[in-house]
Amino acid sequence: MASSQQAVRETGRGRASSSSAGGRKVTFGYHLVEGKTPHGMEDLHVAEFRRLDDGNEDGGDGGSTAVTAILINGETLAVANVGDSRAVAFDVRAGRAQQLSVDHEPLRERDAIEHCGGFVTEIHGDVPRVDAQLATSRAFGDRQIKEHISSDPNVTIEDVGGRRRRWWHGARRPRQRRGVEECFLQRLAEYAICIHGASMEHRNFHVHSSHVHYFEIPPFKEV
């Protein structure tokens, strides 16, 4: 790192920019600061998401969205997502769903898309799209419009210490959870309708258990 004669400056929110003798600029500084910025989990997620996207140069023209969740010491949950893949927490006792991810929609990020030379289409009967193609403003792949979209994730840090929740992420369900599964799926369907608006009420919307992964965060125990 020292031999490359690179200078790093922090820009806040766990991000950094750098300049090198070769004139190449690196944003988010994850190759250089090695987690020393105030938000190390953000740097980690950005680094991994970008590394994955950069490794797609020899791949096809397809694309994908993604969501990840890292549980730290049973107390802190770091959720990162690109596109419209979602992480939703379901509070069993309260019967309430909480979205932990951020939907990356073209209209929300129109300024950034247009700044990169792209455009957002709004056609009646269809969702807004980037360059009349992609329905999300961030994604992996999609090389044909790569210059107009981003693969940088939104990172949410959630304190889960002392609370008991059901976190759905997609493994086989144990028998003891079957009683709450139907309740969760119903709430998740209602949540999706609420987020997307009344237009979904006219669709045959259903969330199947095979689409959902599950794990439980145990209650925090004081010592």
From Swiss-Prot:
Matches recorded under Gene3D superfamilies: PPM-type phosphatase domain
Domain of life of the organism encoding this protein: Eukaryota
Region (Disordered): 1-22
Pfam families to which the protein is assigned, alphabetical: PP2C (PF00481)
Gene Ontology BP terms: regulation of intracellular signal transduction
Alphabetical list of CDD domains matching this protein: PP2Cc (cd00143)
Enzyme class per UniProt: hydrolase
Keywords: Hydrolase, Protein phosphatase
Catalytic activity of the protein: O-phospho-L-seryl-[protein] + H2O = L-seryl-[protein] + phosphate; O-phospho-L-threonyl-[protein] + H2O = L-threonyl-[protein] + phosphate
E.C. no: 3.1.3.16
Signal peptide segment: none
All residue ranges annotated as the PPM-type phosphatase domain in the record: 1-212
Any one GO molecular function term: protein serine/threonine phosphatase activity
Family statement: Belongs to the PP2C family.
Name of the protein in question: Putative protein phosphatase 2C 63
Organism of provenance: Oryza sativa subsp. japonica
